[in-house]
From Swiss-Prot:
Bilayer topology term: Multi-pass membrane protein
Organism: Oryza sativa subsp. japonica (Rice)
Gene: PHT1-3
GO cellular component term, pick one: membrane
InterPro entries: MFS_dom (IPR020846), MFS_sugar_transport-like (IPR005828), MFS_trans_sf (IPR036259), Phos_permease (IPR004738)
Further remarks about this protein from its record: Although related to the sugar transporter family, it does not transport sugars.
Coiled-coil stretches: none
Name the UniProt record assigns to this protein: Probable inorganic phosphate transporter 1-3
Membrane spanning residue stretches: 22-42, 71-91, 100-120, 125-145, 164-184, 212-232, 295-315, 350-370, 374-394, 408-428, 445-465, 484-504
Amino acid sequence: MADGQLKVLTTLDHARTQWYHFMAIVIAGMGFFTDAYDLFCISLVSKLLGRIYYTDLAGDNPGSLPPNVSAAVNGVALCGTLAGQLFFGWLGDKLGRKSVYGFTLVLMVVCSVASGLSFGRTAKGVVATLCFFRFWLGFGIGGDYPLSATIMSEYANKRTRGAFIAAVFAMQGFGILFGAIVALVVSAGFRNAYPAPSYADGRAASLVPEADYVWRIILMFGTVPAALTYYWRMKMPETARYTALIARNAKQAAADMSKVLDTEIQEDADRAEAVAAGGAGNEWGLFSRQFVRRHGVHLVATTSTWFLLDIAFYSQNLFQKDIFSKVGWIPPARTMNAVEEVFRIARAQALIALCGTIPGYWFTVAFIDVAGRFAIQLMGFAMMTVFMLGLAAPYHHWTTPGNHTGFVVMYGFTFFFANFGPNATTFIVPAEIYPARLRSTCHGISAAAGKAGAIVGAFGFLYAAQDPHKPEAGYKPGIGIRNALFVLAGTNFLGMLMTLLVPESKGMSLEEVSKENVADDEEATA
């Protein structure tokens, strides 16, 4: 394919930024908005679940989820996400991006509602059905990662492609914030409608029966934004790169893009045949010798950096409520009633999202096509390492009265540089550097490696952060939060080293980056 490029792809690469680009960002981005809401809202209600289903009124403190239950509730959706990323990533290359794009959204809507309707006669029954539905919710969420990234990368022009993909991913920040806002509104409403004493002042009375509705409403509310965008997902045409390069129908690709870009594109039939013929010998498969030679190092880079990043990112996100409790930013559980605790946790998460998480995403949108992917990812990992060390080394200082605000500010900066850094770039790069016929699959593999890291973070941090001298009930002694933060700092440092393998794709077409236009014999003589 070295002898030319299809006109429709050249037109896409040089198209001016226009209304349809922004529509694509919103349509794909609302999926990520819902993904983040559904994945992280569980951290807002897990303490409430412990109070409702595991409280022993003879105890001095309200109930909490047992270790194995807490790990399952927090981590099962991540297991589903990993499976969904692999399956839908592969399916997106086999059947087309659009063909399976709507199904992931339907699965998310159905399972989100079902999660809120979890049932059972015992605590174990409720938790079991909740975990079942959250696994399949995660499965649908997993499909959104490779499909949304691939669709946006294949629609975008090469000048602002990074910003467009980053903007889709940035909707994750608004999803996290929206989850906190929903929890604030719901808990405030129930708190005012059904006042209750703290656990210390009235153990049984601190948990009103209506509190069972709180967590269910919060879990189900994520269906709203997903359902609103389903129609528009179904209206999107298949990407031109899939239609032209994989389905080998350049004429249809030109017709589809002519409609959405308001530009008349006439694809030359002879050119299309020549390009197709040129690519016929370039159809090596995943993990073939040619793939390993061209993209083996790239796959190591995108999987390892995403894996290392998500260990830290999901540890921080899913268990920030526990960290804030231990440093004293959230009062002890026994001094609050059940609904008040949800309100306090949601308020803390909203502040972190507003001050650290969301700004970081949009700094990436602003600078990704200026500084480049490599520089932002390297800088992000480096700064996360620095701030993690800044939290861990003087940890005892941060836990003393009067220093909690400083801890929260430092903690917020780790989120800022995660999102103005590797949390965004690990999503962007795999959507750019692999050939069209393997793009969705390789993005799915990279994302699944990330979710493997998230599972390590979700299950590992819960146990590792336990106080070595005074672990919580049901837990074995761990290494403590201070040492756990040191481990996360080391994880970020390893991510910085692995970033050295990541190629730069700024300002290049997808075909130039992936060398899809270069045959094996041409590459060998280059």
